[in-house]
Amino acid sequence: MSEEETHNAPIAPEAQPEEINASCRGPVLFLFFSAAVWAVQATGVGLLGSLKMHVPGFLADCPFLTYGRLQANAWVAFLYGFAGNAGLGLTLWMLSRLRGMPLAKPGFVLAGAFLWNAGVTAAMVGITMGDQPGMAGYELPAYASR
C-alpha cells in the first residue's frame, strides 16, 4: 500500500455509546462485582488480623489464623482481588469507549476474569495453608502465580 492509499483509507464507523456499553456491560459488571466482593473479604481478613495483633490469645488454637497468614491474605485480597479486578474493569470500559467500537468477544474477557479470580482464590487458600514463600510483598504460592 502506498502512502497516498493509506491516508485515504476509509475510517471504521464509530458505534453508538449505547452499543459500546451494551457490548462490555457483562464483563465490566462482573469485574466490578468481583472487586467489591474482594474488598469486603480483604477488610474482614484485615480486621481479623488486627484483632490477632492486639489480642494474641484470640483463636490461638487455630494454626491457620496466625497474624502473618492473615496479613498476607489481606494484602493479596486487596491488591490482586480488589485492585486487579477494578483496574481491569475500568480499563476495559475506557478502552472500549475511547476506541469507539464495541467489545468484540466479551466471552473471552469473562473467561479471563474467572481465571483471574480462581488464581487469587488459589493464592489465598495456599497462603492460609502455609504455602507462601518468605518474600514480603510477594506472598503468592508458586502454583497460583505461574
Each PLM stretch: what is its role?
Residues 28-57, 67-99, 106-132, 145-146:
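Hydrophobic cores of alpha-helical transmembrane segments in multi-pass integral membrane proteins
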Residues 136-146:
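Non-cytosolic membrane-interface motifs at loop->transmembrane helix junctions
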